[in-house]
């Protein structure tokens, strides 16, 4: 009996948790990058 199946509940939960944690970090990094490279208040207002 193998415990390395892809459909293992713990594996699913860990993957889901990774996506939840990665998404806001990616978004924050994108906003910060845009704010630095496009200092125009119009563009920053559109992003936020």
UniProtKB/Swiss-Prot annotation:
Subcellular location: Membrane
One GO cellular component term noted in the UniProt record for this chain: membrane
TM spans (from-to): 20-37
Membrane topology: Single-pass membrane protein
Keywords on record: Membrane, Transmembrane, Transmembrane helix
The organism's place on the tree of life at top rank: Eukaryota
Name recorded for this polypeptide: Uncharacterized protein YOR161C-C
Species annotation: Saccharomyces cerevisiae (strain ATCC 204508 / S288c) (Baker's yeast)
């Amino acid at each position: 009996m193998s415990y390395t199946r892809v459909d293992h509940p713990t594996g699913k939960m860990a993957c889901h948790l990774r996506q939840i944690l990665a998404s806001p970090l990616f978004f924050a990094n994108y906003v910060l990058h845009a704010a630095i490279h496009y200092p125009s208040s119009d563009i920053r207002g559109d992003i936020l």
